[in-house]
A protein has these predicted regions:
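Residue-level detector of secondary-structure transition/capping positions
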Residues: 23, 59, 97, 111-112
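Substrate-positioning beta->alpha
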Residues: 2-25
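Histidine (H) residue identity feature
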Residues: 11, 65, 96-97
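Glycine/small-residue-rich pyrophosphate-binding loop that anchors the diphosphate of NDP-sugar donors
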Residues: 6, 43, 80
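Mid/C-terminal beta-alpha module of Rossmann-like enzyme folds, strongest
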Residues: 18, 22-74
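A secondary-structure boundary/capping signal
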Residues: 2-3, 42, 85
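Conserved C-terminal active-site "lid" loop/helix of NAD(P)H-dependent oxidoreductases
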Residues: 37, 47-49, 53, 69-107, ...
Length: 113
C-alpha cells in the first residue's frame, strides 16, 4: 500500500458547502462576485496507507497486515503531492474542512457491525 504519495482528501459535504457558498455569492452579489477557476483540497496530508489505517480504526480492525511502501507507486506516473492552491476561496472566507477520520467514519457507518 502506497505510503509515499501525498493526498489531500476532501469530504463531499465540504465540496457541496463550497459550491453552495459560491452560488449564494452569485444570487446575492456583493463586492466579491466569484468567477474563474477555484481549487479545493482537504487540510490533512495523507498517504493511501494513512487512509487505510484510519478505515481499519473505524471498523475496529487491527490492520497490521497492511504494509506501507515508501517509494513511488508502479504504473502511470502520479504527482508526489496533490495539494492545491485554495487561496482564492479562502480570500472569499470560504473554507470547509471535515477531518478525514470523522468523514470516513460517517461514510462507512452503514458497513460497521
Amino acid at each position: 500500500m502506497s505510503d509515499y504519495e501525498i493526498r489531500r482528501p476532501s469530504h463531499v459535504n465540504d465540496i457541496a458547502s463550497i459550491v453552495y457558498d459560491l452560488s449564494q455569492m452569485l444570487i446575492e452579489p456583493g463586492e466579491n462576485v466569484p468567477s474563474g477557476i477555484y481549487q479545493w483540497c482537504g487540510l490533512q496530508p495523507l498517504t493511501k496507507y494513512d487512509m487505510v489505517k484510519s478505515m481499519a480504526k473505524v471498523f475496529n480492525l487491527d490492520g497490521n497486515h497492511v504494509k506501507g511502501v515508501k517509494e513511488p507507486s508502479p504504473g502511470a506516473p502520479r504527482p508526489f503531492d496533490t495539494t492545491m492552491d485554495t487561496s482564492r476561496l479562502e480570500d472569499l472566507n470560504i473554507s470547509h474542512h471535515t477531518p478525514f477520520e470523522k468523514g470516513i467514519e460517517e461514510c462507512l457507518q452503514k458497513w460497521r457491525n
